[in-house]
Amino acid sequence: MKKILLFLLMGCMLAACSEKPSGPYVVAHRGYWKTDGSAQNSISSLQNAGRIGAYGSEFDVNLTADGQLVVNHDFTYHGLEIAATDFATLHDPSLTLANGELIPTLDEYFEASLAYPGMKLVYELKSKGEPEYEALALPATVEAINRHGVASRIEFISFSLSACVEFAKLMPDNVVEYLGGEIAPAELHEMGITGIDYEYPVFYEHPEWIEEAHKLGMVVNTWTVNKEEDMRKLLELGVDQITTNEPELAQRLIAEIK
């Protein structure tokens, strides 16, 4: 009997050790790029986010004219409209990120992320809400996610309401957060969207939206919070996640509060 009790106790201790620390969580905005030798949305920024143990690395995805998903914030890259340009042109060795890396493909980004299996991948689809574009980009996204086996790590965000609604249908087990900032949580919940990720001044104007979202079981993220005073205020308001260019500062504040 004593052996059985000891076995059960050890099992509980191991389970407790394996649990992910409770939130709030820190998301590195476009990866952790504010370090030597890195750049926004680069493979190194992803690796830096993993190195510091960030909850998630946020990144932006565009679709090229020939159907390649690439990681880049703007709709343009070195003056070229990504949606109207083939991948080979964008991947020219003369066109680099600030740290000398080439523009990453989504496949390359996912492959590099496998070294950090505990880190979430906060996927922003860059879209102007064009149905034809999203009809290609969303299925290609899901295919890439499944190909690399990272489905359990994905959280979707987008300014495109239609993309959020469709992601919620395509991958109902994943968190989908709308970025726009103008819609109350209850209305989004009715559409099947499971989170809000609003620019932080929105929550100063509508702090009640945080409680409203939580009552509906929705996730509350906020961007892009870089000053300590804002981080403290938003943590007091009760956000679940902070997206920031200063992830180590946010980590220290959260550890201090806990």
Could you tell me what each predicted segment is?
Residues I4-M13:
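Sec-dependent N-terminal signal peptides
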Residues C17-K258:
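Phosphate-group recognition and catalysis centered on beta-loop-alpha active-site segments
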